[in-house]
Amino acid sequence: MRVADFSFDLPDELIARFPKQDRTSSRLLSLDGPSGVVEHKVFSDLLELVNENDLLVFNNTRVIPARMFGQKASGGKVEVLVERVLDEHRVLAHVRASKSLKPGNEVILEGKAKATMVARHDTLFELEFEHSQNVLDILNDIGHMPLPPYIDRPDNEADRERYQTVYGEKPGAVAAPTAGLHFDDKLMTALKNKGVQMAFVTLHVGAGTFQPVRVATVDEHIMHSEYIEVPDDVVAAVANTKANGGRVIAIGTTSVRSLESAAKVHGGKLDTYFGDTDIFIYPGYQFNVVDAMITNFHLPESTLIMLVSAFAGQNNIMGAYNTAIEQQYRFFSYGDAMFLTRK
């Protein structure tokens, strides 16, 4: 299977660089996997697409202001993008500098925080901050929201709220689980009032989610690793939903990857799992847990467009993307959404 089979041409003006004023006013393209039928809706119409006893599984990670600018103690400019918080004082980070950091090198970030490079792990640098402050407090104080590279503008104060789900509560992501950006408190309440069940997994989205696939064939690609938590209350909620004839609806590819990973490590049967995952889902994958999903529109030739193609059918997805372009849908993190049922 060729990576080029997942390519499409996107006009630049369809890349959403700012969020819509109202979270639920985004457009929603509904694609039925078995039939390939497409319908055009708005996100608030989700209430009509879900049923009582369906289970929505959200990713409750919270985006940290992970990007910092500063200089090396020796004077050169440096940019730090935190990939993972290791503990109260240490992080793994991508570092851009004129000369690569060496163990013992110090950096001064935003003129306020001092960190020392203590080790290198492949392309990531382990940085240790001074112990007078918790690293999350430092990031909240001086960090910038890590907007994706295709949102080619500086972050602003509004991004601190809008590049964040309303239900995110566990800091650790360096990219938003973007399908969740369309939910507001009013919609969450309306869904609960309808009898829709809710459960929460955690996947701390890493910067690797934006890394391009650099191989020609899909099965050559090596997936990045991310930390997930699928607690036992989620396992119980899924079992109860299936027993009552409801659907498990994943909110975003991160929720899909979390649920399917927790099933994969247990031989295809969902069970509790806390740990790393590098699951790579592409056409041919047999889903064990998820029946439907909500997702944004993804980059061409990305692992995420491969995942949704595995879920709803590659021809269906590529056709729906062409339709979305014709209909002027907004693409990527701040863009519109899709509701997919499994083929």
Curated annotation (Swiss-Prot):
Transfers and isomerizes the ribose moiety from AdoMet to the 7-aminomethyl group of 7-deazaguanine (preQ1-tRNA) to give epoxyqueuosine (oQ-tRNA). HAMAP family: QueA. Coiled coil: none annotated. GO terms for molecular function: S-adenosylmethionine:tRNA ribosyltransferase-isomerase activity. Keywords: Cytoplasm, Queuosine biosynthesis, S-adenosyl-L-methionine, Transferase. This is S-adenosylmethionine:tRNA ribosyltransferase-isomerase. It comes from Pseudoalteromonas translucida (strain TAC 125). One of its GO terms (cellular component) is cytoplasm. Belongs to the QueA family. SUPFAM superfamilies: QueA-like (SSF111337). InterPro entries: QueA (IPR003699), QueA_dom1 (IPR042118), QueA_dom2 (IPR042119), QueA_sf (IPR036100).
